[in-house]
């Protein structure tokens, strides 16, 4: 079961990724984690290449990232499948997977309108010292603007400010709209299965739908 997840930041992808991993016993493969591991260990040839590029402050090429992905999915814990999150981000990367013989069984897209995502994310409030988070609509603190435990002020993290969220959504649409078209076409050709979920539904509802189609 080889799965790619597509969805804007704040669309609930991370929550459903965790559900799929727990339910089906497959690992999540994050290119960010792989690059961090390459920096620490640099155990393989690809890892060494990635480390030297990162140390030089340069962007890691698709070729190196694809090499790291191939190495990672050859490991024992990926025998039953894996979940790719945050990769591929571009058409050349999607082509690269195909050229490297990595077939994908399911592409899952989590669809949520931009204005809903902005409301979800800009409503978040954080108590930075403890890491406790709240939401003005969905999970409010007992006293507005104050942490429940300490009474200290809550803040809006930089990442959750509406202008930051909108900028991230702009990047997502620019990069991912072509991928949606790409994998829809692959599905029409019978090479993968493309499934779209309404990310505005309750988490448990979306999880139940995913379980049904993947079982």
Swiss-Prot record:
Annotated segments matching region LID: 123-160
A biological-process GO annotation: AMP salvage
Residues reported to bind AMP: 31, 36, 58-60, 86-89, 93, 157, 168
Subcellular location as annotated: Cytoplasm
Keyword terms: ATP-binding, Cytoplasm, Kinase, Nucleotide biosynthesis, Nucleotide-binding, Transferase
Top-level division of the source organism's lineage: Bacteria
Keyword ATP-binding set for record: yes
EC numbers: 2.7.4.3
Pfam families registered for this protein in UniProt: ADK, ADK_lid
Catalytic activity: AMP + ATP = 2 ADP
Keyword ATP-binding attached: yes
Protein known as: Adenylate kinase
Any one of the GO CC terms: cytoplasm
Function: Catalyzes the reversible transfer of the terminal phosphate group between ATP and AMP. Plays an important role in cellular energy homeostasis and in adenine nucleotide metabolism.
Primary location recorded for the protein, binned into one broad class: cytoplasm
Binding site for ATP: 10-15, 124, 133-134, 201
Entry comment, domain topic: Consists of three domains, a large central CORE domain and two small peripheral domains, NMPbind and LID, which undergo movements during catalysis. The LID domain closes over the site of phosphoryl transfer upon ATP binding. Assembling and dissambling the active center during each catalytic cycle provides an effective means to prevent ATP hydrolysis.
GO molecular function: adenylate kinase activity; ATP binding
Region of interest (NMP), ranges: 30-60
Family designation: Belongs to the adenylate kinase family.
Segments forming a coiled coil: none
Subunit structure: Monomer.
UniProt pathway annotation: Purine metabolism; AMP biosynthesis via salvage pathway; AMP from ADP: step 1/1
């Amino acid at each position: 079961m080889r799965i790619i997840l597509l969805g804007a930041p704040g669309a609930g992808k991370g929550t459903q990724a965790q559900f799929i991993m727990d339910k089906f016993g497959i690992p999540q493969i994050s290119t960010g984690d792989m690059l961090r591991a390459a920096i620490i260990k640099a155990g393989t040839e690809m890892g060494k290449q990635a480390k030297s590029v990162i140390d030089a402050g340069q962007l890691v090429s698709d070729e190196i990232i694809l090499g790291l992905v191939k190495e990672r999915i050859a490991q024992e814990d990926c025998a039953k499948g894996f979940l790719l999150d945050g990769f591929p981000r571009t058409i050349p990367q999607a082509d690269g997977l195909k050229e490297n013989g990595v077939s994908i069984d399911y592409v899952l897209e989590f669809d949520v309108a931009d204005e809903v995502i902005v409301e979800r994310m800009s409503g978040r409030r954080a108590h930075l010292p403890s890491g406790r988070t709240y939401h003005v609509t969905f999970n409010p603190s007992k006293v507005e603007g104050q942490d429940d435990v300490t009474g200290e002020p809550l803040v809006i993290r930089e990442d959750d400010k509406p202008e930051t969220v909108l900028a991230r959504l702009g990047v997502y649409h620019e990069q991912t709209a072509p991928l949606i078209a790409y994998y829809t076409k692959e599905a029409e050709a019978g090479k993968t299965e493309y499934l779209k979920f309404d990310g505005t539904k309750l988490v448990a509802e979306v999880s139940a739908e995913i379980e049904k189609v993947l079982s």
